[in-house]
Design a protein with these regions (language model features):
Chain A
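Conserved N-terminal structural module of periplasmic/extracytoplasmic solute-binding proteins
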Residues: 2-108, 123-125, 250, 299, ...
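Short amphipathic alpha-helical coupling segments at ligand-binding clamshell hinges
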Residues: 59, 230-237, 319-331, 421
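A structural signal for short loop-to-beta-strand junctions that line the ligand-binding cleft
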Residues: 88-89, 96-97, 126-161, 191, ...
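Hinge/lid segment of periplasmic solute-binding proteins
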Residues: 103-153, 205-207, 291-293, 377-379, ...
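Extracytoplasmic/periplasmic solute-binding protein
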Residues: 142-148, 153, 177-224, 230, ...
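Conserved C-terminal helix/tail region of periplasmic/extracytoplasmic solute-binding proteins
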Residues: 163, 381-444
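Glycine-centered hinge/linker elements that transmit conformational signals in sensory
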Residues: 221-250, 295
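C-terminal lobe and pocket-closing loops
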Residues: 274-286, 299-403, 440-444
Length: 444, 317
């Protein structure tokens, strides 16, 4: 009678939600102190900081030694439910002042009113970071955090197999399609790319690169545009990959996903800095056969890449936002901190979001992975400098992404086209925003 | 284990009428309430309060202002969430998918369980004990572990079964279209056969042996005894296991969620109602809508279980 066991499984989720409830009952003191801070706080303060990046705790100790006025209490919040715990803590009034979060979640938390507006106290740090990174912490033009790391997009490919199939590293996305077809003429089974059925991030990257703007803040409303010429150009590449069966569909959650590349059935991928440290363990058979190249572009004269950002968000109820921002800026931009964090020994996997990354690039490259034929450091530095700064996360990005995930699977199975998906997502997004009381119009 | 192998009393016919309870005095009633207090408190704390909380959540919606970043308001919107759920095509599609899949899978699972129980009923006692224990093993393995085990067997990138098939010169796939349901159904059936068989087997043991002797004297063969005497006398337990399994299927969550790791394009985030609710609450962050969906699912499950019980009971009697 398997319903008992199904229940046992479901109880995992139930336990998670119950813990939310319990947490919600736990605290409750002054959660309404979220006034917009403009002045510097005085005196000695202690603030809590959540992160789950290796090597960060050691850095907070360094900071604490040098800054007796602002003491950081580090909490390792590692776990699958970190964001849920954080949400519960904010609602209970027991949230930390500062927490690690990715750019998408920062926008999501901000939209749910769980962050503190630090536009005024954080402005002085803006110049340290790339424009795209600052965008990531300033959804809708309001700053809610400090950038921590970036992961600009570039390409890794199996140089040995490219040579075998007589193709070269693609400069444009059209080149990639052509190379994929050419390789398949030599070997029917080989795929040039991978698109996971659960993960529309390929489309996000392509759209970001093509200059599309899914969300654009204009005065008091959002212009939602999933069907602009740029967005459709990006969608068309995905469509061609699907139609011509040029991409494998290994799920990134599949334990065997890396075999796809290690055994050479898929021969290229777009990748980023955060993946570099895990190559050595995951590609035992193809070690030394890899080479890095720029991500394929839409316009080689005007190269543009995409990037996810790691950020440090200042949460609602934080009493010392100026100190939190000061510490965050030190952690993510000072030479002292970055030199340690970008050292592979720290295991942080961090790639900075600062304007000049050149001092930190060399150390993060796993040299035994690549054949030494291309300048890996240059590829990474260039990718970081080309991140398009037009991209914005809208206030319902998470809900939109979830909706897109559902349709993305259908696109991969050729049940609907990318264009149909984009058209329906555009309508869905506008309706959902209006439903939440936010003004939005469809773009084109 | 020993408690499981012992034949359990199963209500196949309505038992003799219980003597009407003595009229208890006020003091007695009071004492009775005291005895149930621990249960009542637990029931209140773990069922009534959370359900009440979910209900109050479901009557609200989160609204933003301006560009949507910044403070939000939770406003009372009455039954608007419920109206949305009732008109939510994806939610009802997941319900229909789960029901259709469940009705086929449960029939197969109970059919096999019944067959095995009947076979066991016919063999020697020592063999019975061995087979019962062996068939119960899948049930003893935690569902997450067994799902992961099947996940590795089904994995498009690492499955040894796919390797074998390729060496044999054929290409098979475990997901996509009907295959998705066959793969998932196989997993759930594998997990569920043992336990259901134990229950059916136990109620078979409780049947009076004299019936079989009488039938044999009348010249009935074993299969005839099984079909005409054993099966009609254990319909009670078949209905019960059927109903429990049906409720279990409507709450299907962990197995497809884990399987989604290797077949995301075939098992979508709204594959089952529970997965859809989980996605709304913890991925999208819309607790209010998820609460409304949960309550609708609970009510729909309750109605279905009631109808199922009524219909099957009427047919049997």
């Amino acid at each position: 009678m398997s319903q008992f066991r199904t229940r046992a499984l479901a109880s995992v989720a139930a336990a998670a939600s119950l813990s939310l409830l319990l947490a919600a009952c736990g605290g409750g003191e002054d959660s309404d102190s979220a006034a917009k801070p403009t002045e510097a706080t005085k005196g000695k303060v202690t603030l809590e900081f959540w992160s789950w990046t290796d090597g960060i705790e050691a850095q907070t100790k360094v900071w604490n030694k040098e800054h007796p006025e602002t003491q950081i209490k580090f909490v390792n919040a590692a776990g699958d439910t970190a964001y849920q715990k954080l949400r519960a803590a904010v609602n209970a009034g027991t949230a930390p002042c500062l927490s690690k979060m990715d750019g998408m979640n920062l926008a999501n938390f901000a939209a749910d009113g769980l962050l503190t507006d630090i536009t005024d106290v954080a402005g002085q740090y803006k110049g340290k970071y790339t424009a795209a990174a600052w965008n990531a912490v300033s959804p809708g033009g309001t700053t809610f955090g400090i950038p921590m790391g970036s992961s600009p997009l570039f390409t890794a490919y199996r140089a040995d197999l490219f040579e075998k199939y007589g193709i070269e590293a693609p400069k444009t996305w059209d080149d990639l399609i052509a190379a994929g077809k050419k390789a398949q003429k030599k070997n029917k089974k080989v795929k040039i790319f991978n698109m996971a059925g659960e993960d529309p991030s390929t489309l996000v990257d392509l759209s970001w690169e093509s200059g599309a703007q899914w969300y654009k803040a204009e005065d008091d409303h959002w212009v939602v545009d999933f069907t602009s010429p740029e967005a459709l150009k990006a969608g068309d590449i995905v469509q061609q990959l699907v139609d011509n069966d040029l991409a494998s569909n290994a799920s990134y959650a599949d334990p065997g996903v890396f075999k796809t590349w290690d055994l050479g059935t898929t021969i290229a991928m777009t990748t980023s800095t955060w993946q570099l440290p895990i190559y050595n363990t995951n590609f035992p058979k193809s070690k030394g056969k890899w080479q890095l190249a720029d991500s394929p572009m839409f316009d080689t004269a005007k190269p543009q890449t995409s990037s996810n950002f790691d950020t440090l968000g200042v949460l609602k109820g934080c009493k010392y936002p100026d100190r939190a921002a000061e510490f965050a800026a030190w952690l993510s931009s000072s030479k002292e901190s970055l030199t340690t964090l970008t050292d592979p020994a720290s295991k942080s996997g961090l790639f900075p979001a600062v304007t000049d990354v050149s001092p930190y690039v060399d150390k993060i490259i796993p040299t035994e992975m690549f054949n030494g034929e291309s300048d890996s450091a240059k590829v990474i530095t260039d990718a970081a400098s080309w991140v398009g700064d037009q991209w914005q996360y809208g206030p319902n990005y998470a809900a939109m992404y979830s909706e897109m995930q559902k349709q993305w699977g259908k696109v991969m199975k050729k049940e609907i086209t990318v264009k149909e998906m984009l058209t329906s997502i555009e309508k869905w997004t506008v309706d959902d925003l209006n439903d939440k009381g936010i003004k939005a119009v469809a773009g084109s | 284990m020993s408690t499981l192998t012992r034949p359990a009393k199963v209500a196949t016919d309505s038992p003799a009428r219980r003597p009407s309870p003595r009229r208890a005095g006020r003091r007695g009633a009071y004492k009775g309430v005291l005895f149930t207090l621990p249960f009542l408190l637990g029931f209140l704390a773990t069922y009534v309060v959370p359900i009440g909380y979910a209900f109050s959540q479901s009557l609200h919606e989160k609204k933003s202002t301006g560009l949507g970043f910044g403070p939000t308001r939770i406003v009372y919107t009455g039954f608007s969430n419920f109206a949305s759920v009732l008109g939510d095509g994806a939610f009802w599609a997941s319900m229909g998918r789960t029901l259709l899949f469940g009705s086929v899978q449960i029939t197969v699972m109970l059919g096999i369980a019944l067959l095995l129980a009947l076979l066991l009923d016919g063999v020697a006692a020592r063999a019975v004990r061995f087979f019962r224990a062996a068939l119960l093993i899948p049930y003893v393995i935690p569902a997450v572990v067994s799902t992961l085990m099947w996940l590795f067997l089904y994995s498009p990138t690492g499955s040894p079964l796919l390797d074998l098939a390729e060496r044999a010169g054929t290409e098979i796939t475990f997901f996509g279209g009907l295959n998705t349901y066959l793969s998932l159904g196989n997993l759930l059936t594998w997990q569920g056969i043992g336990f259901n068989m134990i229950l059916i087997s136990a109620s078979l043991q409780a049947l009076p042996r004299e019936l079989y002797e009488a039938a044999r004297l009348d010249g009935a063969r074993e299969w005839r005894i099984a079909w005409s005497i054993k099966v009609p006398n254990i319909t009670g337990i078949l209905v019960l296991t059927g109903m429990f399994s049906l409720i279990g299927r409507l709450q299907l969550f962990g197995e497809p969620l884990i399987m989604r790791q290797i077949a995301p394009e075939s098992i979508n985030t709204d594959f089952t109602p529970m997965m859809e609710i989980y996605d709304k609450a913890f991925k999208v962050g819309d607790y209010q809508y998820a609460a409304a969906e949960s309550l609708v699912l609970a009510v729909a499950t309750g109605i279905l279980a009631f109808v199922f019980y009524r219909v099957t009971n009427r047919k049997m009697s």
